[in-house]
Amino acid sequence: MDEQQWTGQLDLTVFFDGNRSVSRDIFFEKALKVIRPVYLNQSTIPTFYIVNVGGGYLDGDRYRMNVNVEDNAKVTLTSQGATKIYKTPSNHVEQYQTFNLKDNAYLEYVADPIIAYENAKFYQHNTFNLNNSSSLFYTDILTPGYSKTGEAFKYQYMHLINEIYIEDELVTYDNLLLNPNKQSINEIGYMEHYSHYGSAYFIHEDVNQKLIDSVYETISSYSNTFDCRVAISQLPTHGFAVRIFAYRTQIIEKILGIIQSYIAENIYDRKLDFLRKY
């Protein structure tokens, strides 16, 4: 796509300098920007806050982001606020995100919710390129925005595609389409009367069935405590996926945070850093 057609674009490379992970080759323009990295609690892992300076995604907007994590580097990415998709009467909003992880690299991407308002159309395509020793933790939260009638599913559609490659081999293709006009969103097989959706991927060489069972034991009790549905499944590689249905964003954020904290403590032997957004 011609660069002039992007509403916002961002390129970021992180490498390990022998002491800590640092950034280089940062480029952003128009509606996307990245804030100078911070090292929370004297961590060696930089945290980058990605910002949409326009405040929301509008009709026909197109965004592109490319992140490279070099050998032995680690990075945390997050957003500064929710991604708000307003009504798109003519053209849907498109977002393309590519993540390239080299040997022993680790990417932690924990974004705020994607909120689709009445008559919104949103398409997101993520591509993850990993090596055998690369690691990834990635989350998404989908939330219905305000509508005049108060109904939850008044957006036109939300279409999210995630492709995960390891050593150039496609190991996971996740194609999620929520289209209230053509699907019975509240029925079994879709949202099952819940209004909010959350998901996570974790890929690491140490992932096995024992670890997956342990993660599930950590989060399974929340299904009754918060009236939500939680499921975890092994990916066709050394990783797992988590799905959550709930009625509130905060419930999904809490469960995903527990999973992220479990991974930080049990895989990386570190405490999870509070992102200090507010």
Curated annotation (Swiss-Prot):
The protein's location, in the record's own words, is: Cytoplasm
Residue ranges annotated as transmembrane are none
Q: Which Pfam families match?
A: UreD
Which UniProt keyword terms apply here? Chaperone, Cytoplasm, Nickel insertion
Provide the function of this protein. Required for maturation of urease via the functional incorporation of the urease nickel metallocenter.
Q: How does it assemble?
A: UreD, UreF and UreG form a complex that acts as a GTP-hydrolysis-dependent molecular chaperone, activating the urease apoprotein by helping to assemble the nickel containing metallocenter of UreC. The UreE protein probably delivers the nickel.
Task: Identify the PANTHER family for this entry.
Answer: UREASE ACCESSORY PROTEIN D (PTHR33643:SF1)
Name this protein carries in UniProt: Urease accessory protein UreD
